[in-house]
Amino acid sequence: MNVYSNVLDMVGQTPMLEVTHIDTGPCRLFLKLELMNPGGSIKDRIGISMIEEAEKRGDISPGDTIVEATAGNTGLGLALVAAQKGYGLVIVLPDKMSQEKIFNLRAMGAEVILTRSDVGRGHPEYYQDLGKRVAEERGAYFINQFGNPDNPLAHEMGTAPEIVEQMGGDLD
């Protein structure tokens, strides 16, 4: 059993499972169990990537505040990383999010701002537009998962090579 001193070291190297009890036709089907990441999803990987790449560029340093607009697990991945690295985190969420997700974000140290879920892009209360505005008003870093090239970089540099290694290079 591995013993870790930092929860971020536990992100990645998630197991692969071959599906054998349902008909997969002529194919062998494998599942990558990203739920085994400490935050419970693949979004832990992008949280690390987006924050660490911003650090490398000098865009942020511990003590700064990061803002993100999210309707999914990205907020939890960012909260995990921000808490470990000493960043403030503000998450802007549509009001339809579950109370459990909101509770978890707050428990991980994030400030949660709820906004309307019944409006679209261009409306002042649309979650992505509001997230950008909150970052500007607070002088914080808007991480912008939807337009951030460090989001897919997590998979180009981490997830994909990990799959190739776990499969012994035998992919089609």
Language model segments and positions:
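PLP-dependent amino-acid enzyme catalytic core
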Residues: 1-172
